[in-house]
């Protein structure tokens, strides 16, 4: 998911001086459009809500990057001084409406979903979005609907996911054995960093969805793992380019573009050979080959599955494990549920079909996604027609960003939102239902967005996270890497919301 980000705080101060130096030189050449479907600089008929005072050229960037805080935190704090929505200005992007209220977020994402179903994406992303011809990049319309339906009814459909259950279980056994081997490696003292192992397990799973249940190519798994990382790293300066388009002339941005092109070529070399292989019915490749899309478009529609699925799933899983290391009582409660269920079924491991029957496991996954939504600002929405929002007129082409983090941390909706409490999502448990009615809780829990532009792979993503967490907790007791050294829960925002310091934990095999 290409979520809304602004300029990296570490780069911002250096760029401010450059911006003013180049302003006079390039003023006549600045393009105000931003990527695909860019909104006009200021749709004249929009009734903009109040917002913090802005500076010329940079808008509100000086406030968003102040103190090194991540943007979703800063926007949540700024929103406390304004109404349910505010206007934020970001360089060449011009103004956008930022929503931090649960009711208003529901209006944008669900109630008036068709009105806000357009996309605003970064300039560099067109290289990986088949020139904006992928599920995440399309504005809502017939092409988007056809592609999304093919993805959800085929590879992401329940029948196809269930058909690979045996392979999925083998993935979990391989993951556990790999972690065991890493823990026993000389000098590790039982300490492992699970992120890399979870990434590989996720790529194997996604590869079978894309290419069929029998797909088994470890060289491809390794290559795709590297390609996803290189893509994210190569596009790291994309938001500098979007916010200040004249920076395209700077060496650092030009190098970023060249690295992006190199990553694109690597992806093509990985995926292109697979297009000539037989495509099993139900696989994503089978569906894509049935369309009239050119080869280049098929390649990057496949890559979209990995780009959106690998880091989001792996990061959410490691966040969950970090919370369980920090909350041993919750970990033991989860293990007891898993052990009792396995004993009742005479099983040693948790299977995909079991996940929906394990209420505390689901609570752990949902609470993790509440606290660490993988894209805390979601993907920027664009109005496709004139509409109303919070009683104000919003013109077609207006950018609207929903701060999911602010909604998930509203103490009026979620008592003690900073506390990890899986019981919020367990009906009948103490603190269940988030302290409110289940219907309202549904409207204020939006880790995948909502409405017609909700994440197409959310059910598969939740299943994969639950499967990995369940089998790793069933197999190991997770402890701090050293006595008294709890995981660092500081955040880092690259392509998705990740742990700033990757989780390292000591694992002890359970009897």
Curated annotation (Swiss-Prot):
Pathway: Aromatic compound metabolism. The keyword Transmembrane helix applies. Its cofactor is heme. Belongs to the cytochrome P450 family. SUPFAM superfamilies: Cytochrome P450. GO terms for molecular function: heme binding; iron ion binding; monooxygenase activity; oxidoreductase activity, acting on paired donors, with incorporation or reduction of molecular oxygen. Signal peptide: none annotated. It catalyses: (E,E)-feruperate + reduced [NADPH--hemoprotein reductase] + O2 = (E,E)-piperate + oxidized [NADPH--hemoprotein reductase] + 2 H2O + H(+). It comes from the Eukaryota. This is Piperic acid synthase CYP719A37. Heme binds at residue 455. The chain crosses the membrane at residues 7-27. Cytochrome P450 monooxygenase involved in the biosynthesis of aromatic piperamides natural products such as piperine (1-piperoyl-piperidine), the pungent principle contributing, together with several terpenoids, to the aromatic properties of black pepper fruits, and displaying numerous pharmacological activities such as antiproliferative, antitumor, antiangiogenesis, antioxidant, antidiabetic, antiobesity, cardioprotective, antimicrobial, antiaging, and immunomodulatory effects. Catalyzes the conversion of feruperic acid (5-(4-hydroxy-3-methoxyphenyl)-2,4-pentadienoic acid) to piperic acid. The gene is CYP719A37. The keyword NAD does not apply. It is a single-pass membrane protein. It comes from Piper nigrum. Its EC number is 1.14.19.-. GO terms for cellular component: endoplasmic reticulum membrane. It holds the Pfam family p450. Its main location: membrane.
């Amino acid at each position: 998911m290409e979520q809304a980000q602004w300029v990296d705080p570490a780069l911002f101060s250096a760029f401010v001086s450059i911006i003013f130096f180049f302003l006079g030189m390039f003023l006549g050449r600045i393009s105000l459009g931003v990527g695909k479907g860019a909104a006009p600089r200021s749709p004249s008929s929009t009734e903009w809500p109040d917002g913090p005072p802005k500076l010329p050229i940079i808008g509100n960037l000086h406030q968003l990057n102040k103190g090194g805080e991540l943007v979703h935190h800063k926007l949540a704090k700024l929103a406390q001084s304004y109404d349910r929505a505010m206007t934020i200005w970001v360089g060449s992007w011009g103004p956008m409406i930022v929503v931090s209220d649960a009711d208003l977020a529901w209006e944008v994402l669900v109630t008036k979903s068709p009105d806000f179903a357009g996309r605003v994406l970064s300039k560099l992303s067109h290289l990986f979005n088949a020139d904006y011809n992928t599920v995440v990049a399309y504005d809502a319309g017939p092409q988007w609907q056809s592609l999304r339906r093919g993805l959800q009814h085929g590879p992401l459909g329940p029948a196809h996911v269930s058909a690979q259950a045996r392979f999925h279980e083998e993935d979990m056994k391989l993951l556990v054995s790999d972690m065991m081997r890493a823990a026993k490696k000389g000098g590790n003292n039982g300490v492992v960093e699970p992120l890399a192992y979870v990434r590989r397990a996720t790529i194997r799973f996604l590869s079978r969805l894309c290419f069929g249940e029998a797909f088994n190519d470890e060289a491809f798994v390794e290559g795709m793992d590297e390609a996803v990382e290189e893509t994210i790293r190569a596009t790291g300066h994309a938001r500098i380019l979007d916010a200040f388009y004249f920076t395209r002339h700077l060496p650092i941005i030009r190098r970023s573009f060249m690295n992006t092109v190199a990553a694109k070529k690597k992806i093509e070399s990985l995926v292109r050979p697979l297009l000539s292989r037989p495509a099993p019915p139900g696989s994503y490749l089978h569906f894509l080959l049935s369309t009239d899309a050119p080869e280049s478009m098929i390649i990057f529609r496949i890559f979209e599955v990995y780009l959106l699925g690998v880091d989001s799933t792996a990061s959410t899983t490691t966040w969950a494990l970090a919370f369980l290391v920090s909350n041993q009582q919750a970990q033991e409660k989860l293990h007891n549920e898993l052990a009792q269920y396995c004993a009742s079924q005479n099983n040693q491991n948790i299977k995909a079909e079991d996940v929906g029957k394990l209420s505390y496991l689901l609570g752990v996954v949902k609470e993790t996604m509440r606290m660490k939504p993988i894209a805390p600002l979601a993907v920027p929405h664009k109005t496709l027609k004139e509409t109303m929002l919070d009683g104000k007129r919003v013109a077609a082409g207006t950018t609207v960003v929903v701060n999911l983090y602010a909604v998930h941390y509203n103490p009026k909706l979620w008592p003690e939102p900073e506390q990890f409490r899986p019981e919020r999502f367990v009906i009948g448990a103490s603190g269940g239902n988030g302290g409110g009615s289940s219907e309202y809780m549904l409207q204020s829990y939006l880790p995948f967005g909502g409405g017609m532009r909700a994440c197409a792979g959310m059910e598969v993503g939740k299943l994969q996270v639950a499967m990995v967490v369940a089998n790793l907790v069933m197999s190991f007791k997770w402890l701090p890497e050293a006595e008294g050294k709890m995981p660092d829960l500081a955040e880092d925002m690259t392509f998705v919301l990740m742990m700033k310091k990757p989780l390292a934990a000591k694992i002890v095999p359970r009897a």
